[in-house]
C-alpha cells in the first residue's frame, strides 16, 4: 500500500505523515508549484509538484495510484475516479468515500453548482475542527495498522 495525498488544501498532512511514517508506509504529497516548500520531509515522504491547473494534482494522483492504495482528498471527482480504480479513499473530515455514498456526494455538488449558476448563494463547508482531525486520525489509523 502507498498513500497519495491531494495536498494543496489538506489540513491533516501532519497526521498522515506522522502516522504513516510510524507504520513505515510511503506517502506521496501531490501539490501545485504555488505551494512550493523547501521544508525537509521525513524518510518515506515524497512531494510531487504539478502545474497550478484546476485538476493537475488529481490527474497525477490517478497516474500513480494502484488498486488498494490509500488516497486522501476532499475532491469528489478524484474520489470517484479513485474508487473506480479500486483505491481506498478518505476525506480529511474522517469519513470514507464508498460506491454507496459517492453518487449522492456528486449529485449534491452538481445541484449546488446549478444553484450558484442561477445567481443564488449556497452554504460552504463547515469549519474544520479538532474533533474532525481526531476522527480522521482514528479512521486513517484503522487502514494503515493492519
From Swiss-Prot:
<comment type="similarity">
    <text>Belongs to the UPF0178 family.</text>
</comment>
<protein>
    <recommendedName>
        <fullName>UPF0178 protein BCQ_2874</fullName>
    </recommendedName>
</protein>
<dbReference type="Pfam" id="PF02639">
    <property type="entry name" value="DUF188"/>
</dbReference>
<dbReference type="InterPro" id="IPR003791">
    <property type="entry name" value="UPF0178"/>
</dbReference>
